Amino acid sequence: MKLSDIADNAGSRKKRMRIGRGIGSGKGKTGGRGGKGQTARSGVRINGFEGGQMPLHRRLPKRGFNNIFRVEFAEINLDRLQDAIDAGSIDANTTINAESLVKSGVVRRAKGGVRLLGRGEIKAKLTVEVHGASKSAIAAVEKAGGTVKILAPKKDEGEAA
């Protein structure tokens, strides 16, 4: 047996159907698109159009609003913080704040500040300065002998002081 003798199994590679190549091909004339009209033409269908029936986005009620002044915190759990300390990304002896978390790569961006959450355990004695923290996170850090300082909300750079 030679490499040139090896062939694919019968039916493992199916030839693609070439549409619109005569009525004998089985996909000629209209090419599987049915008759005439909008759906037979090329181009985009009308999104959300349900054939005259009241579309779903109009049947459902409007709810809520988007608060343009909403502050979004970068959230970090205790287990993630402990992993970063174990890996050596963060020094437990220094003050841990938003800048140090971004610099170490633990948090990607902290535009509105950082919020500490209580999932997991913390073993190291830490000094943490964050813009928000859950009660369980504060309790866990203080149990390990550390302190949590809650900072005032961050002001936007463009906002007048």
UniProtKB/Swiss-Prot annotation:
Family to which this protein belongs: Belongs to the universal ribosomal protein uL15 family.
GO biological process terms held by the UniProt record: translation
A Gene Ontology cellular-component term: cytosolic large ribosomal subunit
Region of interest: Disordered: 1-50
SUPFAM superfamilies, per database record: Ribosomal proteins L15p and L18e
Biased composition (Gly residues): 21-37
Gene Ontology MF: a single term: structural constituent of ribosome
Domain of life: Bacteria
Role played: Binds to the 23S rRNA.
Alphabetical list of InterPro entries matching this protein: Ribosomal_uL15 (IPR030878), Ribosomal_uL15/eL18 (IPR021131), Ribosomal_uL15/eL18_sf (IPR036227), Ribosomal_uL15_bac-type (IPR005749), Ribosomal_uL15_CS (IPR001196)
UniProt key word rRNA-binding: yes
Record's protein name: Large ribosomal subunit protein uL15
Source taxonomy: Bacteria, Pseudomonadati, Pseudomonadota, Alphaproteobacteria, Hyphomicrobiales
Keywords: Ribonucleoprotein, Ribosomal protein, RNA-binding, rRNA-binding
Binding partners and assembly: Part of the 50S ribosomal subunit.
Keyword field contains Transmembrane: no
